[in-house]
Amino acid sequence: MKITHITTYRLPPRWMFLKIETDEGVVGWGEPVIEGRARTVEAAVHEFADYLIGKDPARINDLWQVMYRAGFYRGGPIMMSAIAGIDQALWDIKGKVLNAPVWQLMGGLVRDKIKAYSWVGGDRPADVIDGIEKLRGIGFDTFKLNGCEEMGVIDNSRAVDAAVNTVAQIREAFGSEIEFGLDFHGRVSAPMAKVLIKELEPYRPLFIEEPVLAEQAEYYPRLAAQTHIPIAAGERMFSRFEFKRVLDAGGLGILQPDLSHAGGITECYKIAGMAEAYDVALAPHCPLGPIALAACLHIDFVSRNAVFQEQSMGIHYNKGAELLDFVKNKEDFSMDGGFFKPLTKPGLGVDIDEARVIELSKSAPDWSNPLWRHADGSVAEW
């Protein structure tokens, strides 16, 4: 079997799919994208395609190593996202050829279901509470929300009080009936992260995500030393070599590699194993589309340390398309009591509606994140 063609489709809301075709008619799908840099990742995919055309798609490990190591410069969000989507599609092909889901090819199940959590948008406490109520109605009891808006390197007590007030009202409204994590999104400096974490501790969030940027990872163990709340990070780390450093330094309780950013299934399975060796939980990052989610689920079901799975159903970024709009077998992604079951169809287990993909790709928007500024006019972290 040989790879004959690689096609990319930029899609709403902020996704990109790729299709790998073979000379035997077997097709694999992947999702390579950096939100806001889809065209750049697309260019990287097609640079790799020049090498991949004519190669045997079954040699996933060798193709991965060539894509990663054959160029002098390597790593980073663009290249690793391109590799990730290609890698997902290669696993999809292998599973279809062998008539088995990817998790079966990786040794079989370690669990029967995995807890899903849902994003909740909204800047005001009432909006967040209303969003949680609606999501509870469709079976969710675990959530993630923004921990704060933009915050200065040293900010005032009003900014701290606003962040804490939202969390306090959520806990007062729902008690222990729900769990929620708080995503700081790297918006907070190390000094302010110390203040916020201390103030938030009485409300027992499930985790605090990216309290500081990955570039400031030396603060993870220092922040963890002052709190009982697990610290989570990883969505802006792109290879096992970056994760190696933070695992060795300590401090993280939950690792969050992104299956569409960190080298795909091949690399993230290794990252999951590294995390287990350090007794660190796994919760793959996934605010993206259905192929990315499917890839995450296959890792969840073969990794003992996986604890819950992010997914983008109803996320505030989803303008123009929802999580399953490009999927024919929507029923396979249905949840029972807030849990996903293993996908059982061969490969990734996603039956893509290719006609809809082609149609919507003709008018796909170029999504970019907003530009925030502080009151003094300086650029703020989004």
Swiss-Prot record:
It comes from the Bacteria. Belongs to the mandelate racemase/muconate lactonizing enzyme family. GalD subfamily. Pathway: Carbohydrate acid metabolism; D-galactonate degradation; D-glyceraldehyde 3-phosphate and pyruvate from D-galactonate: step 1/3. The record marks D258 as: Increases basicity of active site His. Catalyzes the dehydration of D-galactonate to 2-keto-3-deoxy-D-galactonate. It catalyses: D-galactonate = 2-dehydro-3-deoxy-D-galactonate + H2O. It comes from Salmonella paratyphi A (strain AKU_12601). One of its GO terms (molecular function) is galactonate dehydratase activity. Pfam families: MR_MLE_C, MR_MLE_N. Keywords: Lyase, Magnesium, Metal-binding. The keyword Metal-binding applies. This is D-galactonate dehydratase. SUPFAM superfamilies: Enolase C-terminal domain-like, Enolase N-terminal domain-like. Binds 1 Mg(2+) ion per subunit. Reaction proceeds via an anti dehydration. Its EC number is 4.2.1.6. HAMAP family: Galacton_dehydrat. Its cofactor is Mg(2+). GO terms for biological process: amino acid catabolic process; D-galactonate catabolic process. The active site is at H185, H285. The record marks E310 as: Transition state stabilizer. Mg(2+) binds at D183, E209, E235.
